[in-house]
Amino acid sequence: MYKYVIWDFDGTVFDTYPHSSKVFKEELEKYGIYEDFETVDSLSKVSFGHLCTYLLNKYPDFTREKYAAIGKINREDEPGKVFAFPGAKELCEDIVKAGGENWMYSHRGPTAKTLMKEAGMLDLFKDFVLDGDGFPWKPAPDAVLALLERNNADKKDAIMVGDREIDCGSGYNAGIDSCLFMATSYENTRSKYQATNFDELRKIIFGEVK
């Protein structure tokens, strides 16, 4: 069993992309930018930075400040509308019951804890690295290494779980195993494992898959 499970938030534990893509599409239209839902959704699933770069390159009048303003609107609209994936809470509970620990590593800020508390999941997580904690973004290994160090954890006992290659990249670069989970594509990944649902992920975490 992997004793330390490092989770990504968006698209991994919480089903946030449908809501955020809808909000971004609607708010972009207020700036005269018309992109279809599928484009916004697919770009954000690579990374929100990828979406921002796409918009900045395509629309000369679009700015990072406008992007940040839309992000703020999205976050403020999430409570009561964004929920954990079915099976996420149960798996996190079983990890704790088996003597393991859940950690969170997300580019999201304090709203991660707000939504986790709303879902009754906050107490299932022992440690967090969130936006604003001063670490370079994924796939840099710094945050993963810091989590391991401050919890006195052995690398062989830890796994990074995320829906994007940058999540797995941060684990790979830190020297730990990773699982690409519920991803839009499983090609060209550095992850040791791939899983399409929580039942498959459970088997990986609990050592039933080698």
Regions found by a protein language model. Give the residues of each.
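Asp-based, Mg2+/Mn2+-dependent phosphohydrolase catalytic module
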Residues: 1-3, 93-96, 100, 109-210
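N-terminal helical cap/lid subdomain that shapes the substrate entry/recognition surface
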Residues: 2-90, 94-98
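Conserved SAM-binding loop
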Residues: 13, 84, 104, 160-161, ...
